[in-house]
């Protein structure tokens, strides 16, 4: 991953790097890989995430339709 440093502005480059890493999901992946996760735990976590995503999409859809 690359970030351009313009006018020796390292703070701005760091901010851009963090934003890119956040979008790519690197921080989330690092957090998940700190400890081994059993395959059964992974399946349960992914299923729970899918349920949360579905509920969120349904809420957004209802909000758009005005219900």
UniProtKB/Swiss-Prot annotation:
Bilayer-crossing regions: none
Entry protein name: Small ribosomal subunit protein bS21
Keyword Metal-binding found: no
GO cellular component labels: ribonucleoprotein complex; ribosome
Alphabetic keyword roster: Ribonucleoprotein, Ribosomal protein
NCBIfam families: S21p
Annotated InterPro entries: Ribosomal_bS21 (IPR001911), Ribosomal_bS21_CS (IPR018278), Ribosomal_bS21_sf (IPR038380)
GO biological process, one term: translation
Phylogenetic classification of the source organism: Bacteria, Pseudomonadati, Pseudomonadota, Alphaproteobacteria, Acetobacterales
């Amino acid at each position: 991953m690359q970030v351009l440093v313009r006018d020796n502005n390292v703070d701005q480059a760091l901010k851009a790097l963090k934003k890119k890493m956040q979008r790519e999901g690197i921080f989330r992946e690092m957090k998940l890989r700190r400890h081994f996760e059993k395959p059964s735990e992974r399946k349960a976590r992914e299923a729970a995430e899918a349920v949360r995503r579905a509920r969120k999409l349904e809420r957004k859809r209802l909000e758009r339709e005005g219900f």
